[in-house]
UniProtKB/Swiss-Prot annotation:
Pfam families: Diox-like_N, Glyoxalase. It catalyses: catechol + O2 = (2Z,4E)-2-hydroxy-6-oxohexa-2,4-dienoate + H(+). SUPFAM superfamilies: Glyoxalase/Bleomycin resistance protein/Dihydroxybiphenyl dioxygenase. Residues 7-122, 150-269 form the VOC domain. This is Metapyrocatechase. Belongs to the extradiol ring-cleavage dioxygenase family. Homotetramer. Its cofactor is Fe(2+). Pathway: Aromatic compound metabolism; benzoate degradation via hydroxylation. The gene is dmpB. Keywords: Aromatic hydrocarbons catabolism, Dioxygenase, Iron, Metal-binding, Oxidoreductase, Plasmid, Repeat.
Amino acid sequence: MKKGVMRPGHVQLRVLNLESALAHYRDLLGLIEMDRDEQGRVYLKAWTEVDKFSVVLREADQPGMDFMGFKVIDEDCLNRLTQDLLNYGCLIETIPAGELKGCGRRVRFQTPSGHFFELYADKEYTGKWGLEEINPEAWPRNLKGMRAVRFDHCLLYGDELQATYALFTEVLGFYLAEQVIDDDGTRVAQFLSLSTKAHDVAFIHCPEKGKFHHVSFFLETWEDVLRAADLISMTDTSIDIGPTRHGLTHGKTIYFFDPSGNRNEVFCGGDYNYQDHKPVTWLAKDLGKAIFYHDRVLNERFLTVLT
């Protein structure tokens, strides 16, 4: 957090049918519906999150990610980072407070990889869902589905990874936690963090700009991941891979698709990092084991199905 960017705050996803998407994210993943707006967007959050929302669903003709937002420490920090982005050569769009319900002024920019990100300082504080602030119980007893704990990260595909890396590290204060290096020594995947997490956002090289691989939600235990797999089967939800373990980050994971084809992940565990740790490096020739630690064989669908 050396530049004042604290954490992932929200992601806006495009879905083909709002009600079927809502049934997926609310009833299967277990997010809580918090609000709707005049544009028809639906706002959701996981139960441990203290701000009003972390996921926004927007009905559209094509699936994918509109943007990902990061929360900064205060308005002064937002102003400073805005100027830093301008000085770096980024084009800036300022979105007024209230355009997302309960969210303050947002500053949006596009990365060299073709993805849109935004920074904001203020969002309505609603507290952890279903718990009192004083003497809180361990968890709410009326959670649904997979009982997602928090929105954790996004994995994105695009080109110009080195330029994107420079923007995130030099301007926004991220650090490199893990990477994949090809035979020429070129970084083809980068896992960037603001915190002790294995990653807050990750990028994999792709010749096409602005592609979305997955949005990820944290669960508490391996038993919860297995239970998520049961729910995927019970609901005939399209599965991608898992349950399994990653070599990269060592998280225990399962991947599946929402009704629009956007890939989701739920996971538990994984490595921790501090900024004095050296980046963990995997070799591209061992990518099968890096992604699927048990099978050690690449799933072509996992690499090529993007929105």
